[in-house]
Every structure is written in structure tokens, then in C-alpha cells.
């Protein structure tokens, strides 16, 4: 049995890669929460759909997340957490490409958001599942707690911030906000892999 270490907040942050993964979590949850809260409004304002149809199509983003998490539960053991995260990022990027095509039919946007949702689905559980391997089983309990805290920060405040920004710039910036958070996540993911590799080589 592994005895969890009772580390302070500062001690957890000193573990190589922990700060990076926390900001990754915040970035991912920011993307997911913006999609969950604002996709329906995007359909109304940008694609001209009525509220009922927009709400129906908006729910497909969340269904995409749920479906892909169900599927990932069966294939994660075969592919591994790292490949699942990379696959998720690729799917999100493909979805964004569909969303930024100018003057496109709203059906293409629906497909784009579904693909983004499917890409987002496996990322959250994959990061959590990889925590013991990345930072040690004895540290994982405390670090996962921090991950949840940063996840809630992103989920709570980013949709509010997006609402303020979109009121000034227009809600059509939503796909570009997706891209913004995806780029942050990708860059941090690359640095995290280098940091973890260096840490393991030292050990």
C-alpha cells in the first residue's frame, strides 16, 4: 500500500511538471466550459438559428464529450494516456478548422462543435489517470486535488470572462477562443513531456 505524502501547496508546486499540468487543466476546462455555456448562443447570433434549434444543436457538443469519454474508457489501456491526449488535441483542431471556414452552412458548424466535443472528452480523464505515473503514487492524491481546484477555476470564471469579451468583440470569436486555449494546452503539454523526461532521467 502506498502512503500518500502530506505535502503543502508550495511543496506540490516544486514537483517538476506540476505547475504545467495545473495550467493545462485550467486551459482545457476553460475551453470545455466556454463550449458548454456559449455554443447555443453562437448558433443564434452567428448562424441565425432559433433558440429551440440552437439549444438542441448546442447539446451535441456535450454529447460529443460524453460519447468520446465512454469510448476512451475502452481504448485508453491500449493507446495510453499520452496518445489519448494527443488524439484529443487533433480532434479539437479539426473541429476548429470546420468552425472558422467562412460563410459555411450551419450543419458544418454543428459537425465542427461535435468533433471539438469528442476531442475534449478523453483529455480530462487522461490527465487525471496519468498523475500517479507522472508524479508518483505517493504524491498523486494531493496533486489530483489541485487539478480539480484549477479545473473549477477555469470552469467557473472563463465563461464569465468570455461573456464580457464577446459583448465587446462579438460571439463569433468563440472558435478563436477554442484555438487560443488549445495552443496554450499544446505548448504546455510539450514542455510537460520534456520536464517529465528530464526528471525521470535524473532519477
Predicted segments, located by residue:
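Intracellular juxtamembrane helix-capping segments at the cytosolic ends
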Residues: 122-135
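Multi-pass alpha-helical transporter architecture, strongest
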Residues: 179-203
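Juxtamembrane intracellular "pre-TM" segments in multi-pass secondary transporters
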Residues: 1-21
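Structural signature of the two symmetry-related core transmembrane helices
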Residues: 83-97
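Helix-to-loop junctions at the C-terminal end of transmembrane segments
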Residues: 69-80, 166
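Extracytoplasmic gate region of multi-pass secondary transporters
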Residues: 16-59, 63-66
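Paired small-residue
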Residues: 95, 107-115
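A late C-terminal transmembrane helix in Major Facilitator Superfamily
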Residues: 132-171
Amino acid at each position: 500500500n502506498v502512503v500518500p505524502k502530506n505535502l503543502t501547496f508550495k511543496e506540490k508546486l516544486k514537483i517538476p511538471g506540476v505547475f504545467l499540468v495545473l495550467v493545462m487543466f485550467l486551459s482545457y476546462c476553460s475551453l470545455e466550459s466556454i463550449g458548454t455555456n456559449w455554443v447555443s448562443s453562437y448558433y443564434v447570433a452567428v448562424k441565425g438559428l432559433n433558440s429551440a434549434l440552437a439549444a438542441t444543436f448546442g447539446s451535441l457538443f456535450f454529447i460529443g464529450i460524453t460519447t468520446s469519454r465512454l469510448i476512451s474508457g475502452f481504448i485508453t489501456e491500449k493507446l495510453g494516456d499520452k496518445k489519448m491526449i494527443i488524439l484529443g488535441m487533433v480532434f479539437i483542431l479539426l473541429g476548429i478548422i470546420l468552425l472558422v471556414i467562412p460563410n459555411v452552412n450551419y450543419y458544418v458548424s454543428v459537425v465542427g462543435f461535435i468533433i471539438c466535443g469528442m476531442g475534449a472528452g478523453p483529455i480530462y480523464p487522461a490527465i487525471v489517470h496519468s498523475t500517479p505515473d507522472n508524479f508518483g503514487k505517493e504524491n498523486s492524491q494531493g496533486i489530483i486535488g489541485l487539478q480539480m481546484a484549477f479545473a473549477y477555476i477555469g470552469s467557473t470564471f472563463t465563461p464569465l470572462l468570455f461573456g464580457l469579451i464577446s459583448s465587446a468583440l462579438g460571439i463569433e470569436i468563440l472558435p478563436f477562443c477554442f484555438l487560443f486555449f488549445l495552443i496554450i494546452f499544446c505548448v504546455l503539454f510539450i514542455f510537460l513531456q520534456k520536464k517529465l523526461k528530464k526528471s525521470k532521467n535524473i532519477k
